[in-house]
Amino acid sequence: MEKDKKYILRYALLDYIATLIAWQLFNIYRFYEVRSTVYFNTLGDFLINTKAILMGIGMPLFWLIVYFYSGYYAKPRQKNHTSDLLSTLFSTLTGSLIIFFAVIINDYPEQYTLYYRVFAGLFLIHFFCTWFVRFLQTSRLLNLHAEGKVGINVLIIGSGKVAGKLSRQMQQTKNSSAYLLKGFIRVNSEEKAVAEQDILGDTEQLKEIIKEQRIEALILATDRQDSDYTEGLLKQLYVYHLDILSVIHKQDLLFSNITLYSLPGVPLKYLSPTQLKPWEQNLKRSTDILVSVLGLLVLSPLFVFLALRIRLESAGPILYRQERLGKEMKPFTILKFRTMFAHSEPEGPLLSSLNDERITPFGRFLRKYRLDELPQLWNVLKGEMSLVGPRPERRFYVERIVDQAPQYYLVYRVKPGITSLGMVKYGYADSVEKMIERLEYDLIY
């Protein structure tokens, strides 16, 4: 989000400055600690030699990459000192090990024990420099949270006793919470236990309220706790593509697979989680880029052959372009090798079937081995898709699916993929019913 970009840049800039200073301090320490093996007469000569200057430029960039892959820059407005400490400890240890074996081990100290002291110096200097600037920035951020100037705007769905208790807990911990409570949403005939002026409306007005208040998360806190009632509410909330959390009820403690999120002193459960952690998402994206680039290069001769074969078999374009819905339901143009005769949908969208007469003979071969999907490597490289994820669908079919299965909105919290477990299980779906059956597997992502 736009609000996050500002704080991501701020944290990244401070990290850059901290690592730049830390590397120079480490070089000073390194010069005196391993002086007998450093071929410079003075510290000044050591710090301004060409290699040291290049390393001074490259090291901060290296550290930013390490911090990025650690997931530190995800959700920058939800930082706290504990998470900062743990994340900084883990990432600086990882980065220090890489630098030690790539750079420091070439120093060849006279005493083997110097290796340990140099590594300890590298780790401790980088850790304290980085953690110090992060501590200052996060302290400032927490002060802004307490003043209500920065945070995640949330609504509580409910206005009864449970909602009232939750709001009091949030008020008591507002100094350390990233969530800014904007108000309550009345649900049916629930007995009111909060101030009337804090109730912004009911579920029928929720769309307008979310837009006006710039809401980023919803917390379900109704007095009724039965699963059918909760499921009915969730079906109304999924459409907004926001984080959805809920207070924890006694029956939730019977299940070990719920995803927890804790406000300070207020445990909540996530009802719309993504399965991958931030660092896993970063690693997945890097894998997508690497594999898609290699795939496009290595398979280019095959692409040429398939393109010629398609062109010779029937009139029409080689590539089939169609609008699909991607992450957060943003439309994009998907690419495929054409497997049908041109103009095969004169009367509107129509799903294909196993013996569909619109499919060309060579198109059947392409579909059998999924070769028609290969051009989507370009979609993956552009960031519109991933190698693995729920299959993207046309808006026409999405609207019909969500009418019967509103939880389908959850798949749009992640990027669609070239392949998925549902695709392996069901193949090409030839009806909305099969698409809904495939949803069971798509929700895994």
Task: List the model feature ranges, each with a label.
Residues 1-149:
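Signature of alpha-helical transmembrane segments in polytopic membrane proteins
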Residues 88-92, 147-165, 317-340:
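Membrane-cytosol interface motif
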Residues 352-415:
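A short, structured surface patch at a secondary-structure boundary
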